[in-house]
C-alpha cells in the first residue's frame, strides 16, 4: 500500500490553499523549487498527476482524495495529542457554508465552541447545492449542504430547514404589483440572485407562476445581507429566509408578496468520519442550535 509522506502532502495542500507555488513556498518557508520537488515526488509515488497546473492550480481526483486524507489526519492528531496542544497554535477548521446560514444561525451556533476552544475558523462561502463538493475535494472538513446522502467515509445529520419568503418593500409592491403578483407583473419586477448559479428565485417563479428560467430581470449580488438592504430600499423583490427578516416583517418594512407560498431548503451537516473531539464539539453545537431555530417538520 502506498503511504504518502505527510510533509510532501502538506506541500500539495499549500499550493491549493495559497493558489500557487510561489505563495505556497512562502507559507512553508522553503523554496519554490522545493515545493515543486515535493509534489513531483508525490506524483511519482502514485503514478499520476495530483495537480492541474492551471491558474490557480486545482487538485485532480486523486489529489482531492489525498487532501481529504490530510484533513482527517490533522483532526485525528488533535484528538490524540489532547492536552499537549493546550497553549499551542489554535487548530484551523475549514468549513463550507451557505451565505444564508452564515447570515442567520451559524455564528450564534458556533459561539460557545469559539469561546471555549482554541480554534480558528476558515469559513468558505458557497451555495448550499455545492458545499458538499468542497468536502469531496478535501478543501474543508465539514459542510452545510442540502444533500442528504453522506459521501464515502463521511457522516451526515439533519440540521433543519430554512423557509424562504418572496418579499419586497410596500412601495415596491405598489409600483410593480398594484393588482397582486401575477405572471405578467413578475416579468417587469427586478429581482436578486446570489450568483449566476443561484436558482432559488427562478425555481420559485417556475414552480408557482410557470415562468421559464431567465425571464425575469435579476441583479447579481454576492451577499445575503445585501438582499435585505435591496428589498428594504425598494430596489428589488427577493427570496429571503424568514429567520433573517422577522423584525422587518413584523414592522411592515417588508411584506410577504405571496402569502401561503414559500421555498423550503432542508440543510444537512456533513463531516469526515471518524470525528475528532473538536469536530464532535462543532457537530453538537450545530445540531443543538439548528434544532432550536430551523424548521424540523
UniProtKB/Swiss-Prot annotation:
Q: In which residue ranges does the UniProt entry place its DNA-binding region annotation?
A: 21-40
* Highest taxon of source: Bacteria
UniProt xrefs under InterPro entries: ArgP, ArgP_gammaproteobact, LTTR, LysR_subst-bd, Tscrpt_reg_HTH_LysR, WH-like_DNA-bd_sf, WH_DNA-bd_sf
One Pfam family hit: HTH_1
Task: Describe the location of the HTH lysR-type domain by residue ranges.
Answer: 4-60
Q: Which SUPFAM superfamilies match?
A: Periplasmic binding protein-like II, Winged helix' DNA-binding domain
Q: Which GO terms describe its molecular function?
A: DNA binding; DNA-binding transcription factor activity
Give UniProt keywords alphabetically: DNA-binding, Transcription, Transcription regulation
The entry assigns this protein to a family as follows: Belongs to the LysR transcriptional regulatory family.
**Which NCBIfam families does the record cross-reference, listed alphabetically?**
argP, PRK03635.1, PRK13348.1
The protein's job, in short, is: Controls the transcription of genes involved in arginine and lysine metabolism.
How is this protein organized at the quaternary level? Homodimer.
Record-linked HAMAP family: HTH_type_ArgP
The name under which this protein is listed is: HTH-type transcriptional regulator ArgP
From what organism does this protein derive? Answer: Salmonella typhi
